[in-house]
Amino acid sequence: MIQVRDVVKSFDGNVVLNHISADFEDGKVNMIIGQSGSGKTVLMKSMIGLHQIDEGQILFDTRNGQQNLAGMKEKEVRMLHREVGMLFQGSALFDSMTVQENVMYPLEMFSDMTNEEMVARARFCLERVNMPERSFNLMPSEISGGMQKRVAIARAIALNPKYLFCDEPNSGLDPKTSLVIDQLIQDITREYNICTIVNSHDMNSIMEIGDNIVFLRNGIKEWQGSRFEIFHADNEALNDFVFASELFKKVKSANG
């Protein structure tokens, strides 16, 4: 679990996160949503230590007890990152490495495994995301964008993380492939009881897998709830966000 408590972040005097408090739960897909400029990317980057917050606390339940990210030294942040998997907006695979070598990379950097153990773990993770064995020795350029995203997920879970951060994981994918990636993220979250945090503005994805949703507007948390509550939320800003989405337009069109 991650507890964000009264977090403030400013850039050049401009408040981007204004006293944000929210809980992000284990075994659930926690989504940070909002329009561009709402602060969702800054919040996610603050939660993984890429931005130093001005005020507040970001509390992680780690294998060594609860730790406050705010004020951690660089070495301590690196130690925390061993429990964190990251899925970037682009797949961010290394072009010079094979599919299997890409998944082995974090193991080489952060684990004490033998080469044989790393190979076995990488292959297990690739199989878990339904990558065919014939693809393991291919280069990223030789597989599709959807497969590249699967490899990125396999790499993100290689170290058996407690936390998985996903930045717009469906960016650039067609609807069918996006659904597959959503289901993979949801299944892995449930199976390994991971605290998954997804930064998204895609209503299809939000309504497919959003267990715990935090809606930001202009750096303020306007609403928090589940995907089953989102269409009934008594919040004008959230309603505007939902009604402007392509998903709502399709539903409205289908219903005449």
Question: What name fits each language-model region?
Answer:
Residues 160:
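Conserved catalytic motifs of ABC-family nucleotide-binding domains
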Residues 57-79:
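ABC ATPase NBD Q-loop/coupling interface
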Residues 48:
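Helix-to-loop junction immediately C-terminal to a conserved catalytic motif
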Residues 200-201:
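H-loop/switch region of ABC-family ATPase nucleotide-binding domains
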Residues 116-134:
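Conserved ABC ATPase "signature" region
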Residues 164-167:
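Catalytic Walker B motif of ABC-type/P-loop ATPase nucleotide-binding domains
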Residues 139-143, 147:
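Conserved ABC ATPase signature
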